[in-house]
């Protein structure tokens, strides 16, 4: 769990750093080399995976941060449903319902999940 969170955090740093021209930890503008270095050292990726991740974020600006925002909305909706439904909450039913909703923006998605009755 923690290693996955470290990777997600590193992806956000890389994505934002490379696309907004921020300085890396060595005081240089973020580039593919500094991205791979961070992913190797902080997210513990091997060279092949750090290269692949770097290419991914060079070609898909904003993907890392949008993924993390979506994850937070999903997790909050799930925690709210657990609190609202108590012992009636079913993780499997929650996920089934959430996936059946289909694609939509995060605000309508959160509102839809807030109205879920557990069935």
Task: Cite the ranges covered by each PLM segment.
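N-terminal maturation segment of proteins
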Residues: 1-119
């Amino acid at each position: 769990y923690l290693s996955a969170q470290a990777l997600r955090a590193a992806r956000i740093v890389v994505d934002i750093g490379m696309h907004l021209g921020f300085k890396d930890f060595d005081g240089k503008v973020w580039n593919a080399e500094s991205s791979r270095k961070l992913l190797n050292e902080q997210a513990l990726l091997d060279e092949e995976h750090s290269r692949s991740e770097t290419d991914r974020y060079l070609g898909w600006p904003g993907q890392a941060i949008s993924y993390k925002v979506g994850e937070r909305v999903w997790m909050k909706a799930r925690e709210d449903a657990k609190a609202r439904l108590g012992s009636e909450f079913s993780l499997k039913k929650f996920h089934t319902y959430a996936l059946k909703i289909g694609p939509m923006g995060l605000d309508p998605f959160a509102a839809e999940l807030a109205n879920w009755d557990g069935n």
